[in-house]
Structures are given as structure tokens and as C-alpha cells.
């Protein structure tokens, strides 16, 4: 009798524990809108904080002091440091473009149009977009990790204590350098891509240098050049401001620095691609 009583008591205790761990469905359902509301408010506040920080950085460009040595150093990091990957990517993409387009033009006996297609594709779209993605992956992450490390080690707080504006000292040189260097890197990418396309066209299609380069240059007009140089300026501004924002708003120590680095690359790349679409629509409307 005692054995049955002890078994019943054990089963009752087990049932009580299961009931205590089970969450009521009503409370889970009622908390979901609250959680979504908190997430939405947090994201809206982050976007607002980003725009305020970017506006402060742009405002600093029109008043002294200017940290020109820091700006030149950042231009070297962003521009010269990115040249190898820009050149390699340009050669590869230019050659692949010729291979893909030539196969279609050969069906109609119009292989001479290869130069036109490669030139327009590189200058209008691929040059600015691919350059922005490469610079974002290399430099937005570097800005976020560098500034995030300074925040974690309290160097930014020490800078404020000494009366130095961190936005003017740290963010403004990076923004200026990136806005100036991304268009130049895009020009390098376009030229190297055309060179890579010519190498492939001359070996596989037997196109002469005069024929290829004449068609490639004549295919472009002023609208294509403006479109190819306007996009990189906007992309450079996005890359620099997002990278600096993610770095200056690091929380959570060294783990936060790692998260900020990843976030900077993802957000800047996605924003560049989204803005690319709307800029293309606007510029095509203006120059067609």
C-alpha cells in the first residue's frame, strides 16, 4: 500500500513540474506584439541615430579644423590598399563579359559589337556596383573594427575628455577619403575591365585593337559617364558613414566589435545595392 502511495506521489510531483514549466499560450500570444514593437522602436531609433551622426560628419566638412594628414592616410588605406583586388576583379570580370557576350554575338555574325556591350556594362553598372561591394567588404569592416576597438578601450572617451570631437577627428577623414577614392577606384576598375575584355577578345575572337577600342569608346556618351561617376560618390558616402556608425556605436566588449564588423559589411553592401537601383532609374530618366 505504501509502495502505491509513493508511486502516486511521485507521479503527482512530476505532473506539477511539467505544469510549472509549461508557458500559457495566452501569455506567449500577448507578448508577441510587445516584442515586435520593441524591436521596431529599436531599429527606428538606430536609423535616426545613423542619420544624425552622418549629418554631423557632413557638417564638420564645412568648418575648421581639418585633419588633412588623417585624411591623406585614409585615402592611402582606402585607395592604394584596395588597388590589387580592384585590378584582379576588373581583369576577371572584363574577360568573362567578353566570353559571355561573344557567344551570343557570334550567332548573328556581329562580334564587333562585343566592345560596345562590355564598355556599356562596365561603365554604367558593373564598375560602380562591384567596386562598391569590394570596398565595402575591405574598408567598411576595417573602419568598424578600428573605431569599435577604440570605443571598447575607452580611447574615444579620452578624446572627448581632452576636448577633441571624435566625429571630426575620426569620422570626417574617413568619409572624405572614401567619397574621393571610390570614384577613382571605379575608373581603374572600368579601364582594367576593358583591358581584360580586349585581351580575351583579341585571342578568342581575333578582334583588332583599333576595332575593339573604337567601338568601346564610341558606345559611351556623356550620360553614361555621369552615371558611372555619380554612383560611386553616393556609394562611398554610404560605405564610410555605415562603417563609422557601426564602429562608434559598439556595445558588448570585444564580441561587440566582431558583430559591428559583420553588420557594417552587410548593411553597407545592401544599402549600396538598393540605392543603385533608384539611382539607375533617376539617371536613366534624366539622360534619356
Q: What residue spans do the PLM features occupy?
A:
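Membrane-interfacial helix-loop-helix connectors in multipass membrane proteins
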Residues: 100-123, 191-233, 237, 241-263, ...
Amino acid at each position: 500500500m505504501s509502495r502505491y502511495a509513493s508511486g502516486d506521489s511521485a507521479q503527482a510531483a512530476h505532473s506539477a513540474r511539467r505544469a510549472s514549466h509549461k508557458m500559457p499560450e495566452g501569455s506567449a500570444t500577448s507578448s508577441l506584439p510587445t516584442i515586435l514593437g520593441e524591436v521596431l522602436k529599436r531599429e527606428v531609433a538606430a536609423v535616426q541615430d545613423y542619420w544624425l551622426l552622418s549629418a554631423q560628419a557632413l557638417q564638420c566638412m564645412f568648418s575648421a579644423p581639418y585633419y588633412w594628414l588623417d585624411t591623406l592616410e585614409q585615402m592611402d588605406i582606402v585607395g592604394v590598399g584596395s588597388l590589387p583586388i580592384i585590378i584582379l576583379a576588373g581583369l576577371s570580370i572584363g574577360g568573362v563579359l567578353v566570353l559571355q557576350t561573344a557567344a551570343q554575338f557570334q550567332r548573328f555574325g556581329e562580334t564587333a559589337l562585343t566592345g560596345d556591350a562590355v564598355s556599356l556594362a562596365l561603365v554604367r553598372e558593373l564598375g560602380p556596383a562591384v567596386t562598391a561591394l569590394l570596398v565595402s567588404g575591405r574598408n567598411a569592416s576595417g573602419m568598424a573594427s578600428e573605431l569599435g576597438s577604440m570605443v571598447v578601450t575607452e580611447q574615444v572617451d579620452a578624446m572627448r575628455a581632452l576636448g577633441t570631437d571624435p566625429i571630426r577627428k575620426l569620422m570626417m577623414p574617413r568619409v572624405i577619403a572614401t567619397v574621393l577614392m571610390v570614384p577613382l577606384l571605379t575608373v581603374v576598375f572600368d579601364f582594367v575591365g576593358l583591358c581584360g575584355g580586349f585581351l580575351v577578345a583579341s585571342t578568342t575572337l581575333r578582334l583588332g585593337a583599333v576595332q575593339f577600342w573604337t567601338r568601346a569608346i564610341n558606345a559611351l556618351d556623356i550620360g553614361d559617364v555621369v552615371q558611372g561617376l555619380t554612383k560611386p560618390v553616393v556609394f562611398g558616402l554610404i560605405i564610410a558613414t555605415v562603417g563609422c556608425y557601426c564602429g562608434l556605436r559598439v556595445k558588448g566588449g570585444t564580441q561587440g566589435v566582431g558583430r559591428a564588423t559583420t553588420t557594417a559589411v552587410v548593411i553597407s553592401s545592401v544599402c549600396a545595392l538598393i540605392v543603385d537601383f533608384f539611382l539607375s532609374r533617376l539617371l536613366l530618366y534624366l539622360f534619356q
